Amino acid sequence: GERGCASCHEDDNPQLGAQVNANLTDGVCGACHGRQKAEALAHQISDVHRDAGMDCMSCHTLEDMHGDGNAYLSMLDEGAIDTKCSDCHTSVASNSYHSMHGETVSCSACHIQSVVTCNNCHFESEVEVHKKIAYGQFKNWKFLLNRNGMVEIGNYQSVTHNGKAVVAFGPYYAHTIAKDAVSCGDCHGNEHVEQWHDQGVIDVVVWDETKGDPNGKNLVAAQGIIPIPPNYFEGGMRFDFVTRTAVGSGQWEFVKTGADIYQLLYGTPLT
């Protein structure tokens, strides 16, 4: 629904009088930003800023929260988010990593440890009982794409409905920062790059019935750093999809391999 002052500031008065709660906690932000909340709580992925006692508002500006007077379609629009790593990190260490990649690879592409992905949302549940139900969340991976001449972190959302499937990719920022999140070999010549070079496809999420899960949760997700290749929409990334056997059921079953629609917004494939 539409968000207003009381969505964050928790005032009992719907007309918002003079008294509002200005002491916001990360829990307020997490009420909407569920993946970021899951990074810290459900999956307990460390973050150097969080570990240092910082919270959301330590980095994000009032303009990020309240807007700057311009209308944006998405927080991914240029100018919509004011916060940058360089606001605090005015200089970087002199080393081979920064000298080699500093102009073409974003800070987050290397320093984010993992993204959290809500995989395979069962849209029948959203339509019929107004409840979001995903197959589950995957972690220990991150996707790479191009954006404005830089290699950036990406993520995706996948949805099924009545036998149809959609995958939408876009840039993403996870709050899972670490100093030594990757090594050279994590990107260069990793198993996903090699599979794409050899076969023209990357196995991202694959149905494996040999898992024998009693609830049919037999999807296996890739691990590590996964490039979004130029043929991502032509079978270059394998996604298997499942659906619930019925709305309200806890049982899942295989539906198909491959999405009916692929989208990549605010970025281009990694080349």
Task: Locate predicted features.
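C-type cytochrome heme-c attachment and multiheme electron-transfer modules
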Residues: 1-14, 21-271
